[in-house]
Amino acid sequence: SNEKLFSCSVCGKCFALKTELTIHCRSHSGEKAFHCTECGKYFQHRSNLRRHQRYHTGDKPFTCFECGTCFVNYSWLMLHIRMHTGERPFSCSECGKRFARRSVLEAHQKIHTGERPFSCSECGKGFIKQCDLARHYRTHTGEKPFPCPECGKCFTQSMQLIRHRRTHTGEKPFACSECGKCFAQNSHLTQHRLGHTGEKPFSCSECGKCFSRRSHLIAHLKSH
């Protein structure tokens, strides 16, 4: 009953159902048979089309049990949950630094290779990621494409808008696993955690004194 009767003429992979073979063959042909009636975009798989259509409908069926934030797809929820758990499963083979996302690790590894494949046509500055180049380019154009629907203030980066909107909503999605205190920004949580660990990562190049906060180091440097 487990015999696989339908084989791919390109790679030889076998399938029990003809429909499975048909879907698989699209990975070779590049055929995109599923069409979004809203925007005209095509997809290889029906599941990809359904996921895409949520952007049009606003449906976000995947909810974080920690903070209630909702997501269009399950993989984004899993990435978000790592912000609460602190899980960083992807480690750099060069320096050991760990990351929650593989894409962030891959971008980080270019620091070691020195590769900066995306360069600004205005000033020639190079960037590791294309999105960093796009953000940088707005410093030349002055474009601020992300407006706040509450107050109208505009931002050059989507993350700046997300952080700003928390000043309206009061949302604090980043919780300390030690004491439960919540923060609006992940960087504030990271800073807070140093109080539990006693870690002081900012050291004075003049005298070697260490500090838990960069602002404390900067204030200290003025004494030299």
UniProtKB/Swiss-Prot annotation:
Give compartment(s): Nucleus
- Predominant location: nucleus
According to the UniProt record, one GO cellular component term is: nucleus
Q: A Pfam family matched by this chain, by name?
A: zf-H2C2_2
- Report C2H2-type zinc finger ranges: 6-28, 34-56, 62-84, 90-112, 118-140, 146-168, 174-196, 202-224
Q: Give an example GO molecular function.
A: zinc ion binding
Per UniProt, which keywords does this protein have? DNA-binding, Metal-binding, Nucleus, Repeat, Transcription, Transcription regulation, Zinc, Zinc-finger
Q: Which family does it belong to?
A: Belongs to the krueppel C2H2-type zinc-finger protein family.
Physiological role:
May be involved in transcriptional regulation.
Q: What is this protein called?
A: Oocyte zinc finger protein XlCOF6.1
The record lists the organism as Xenopus laevis (African clawed frog)
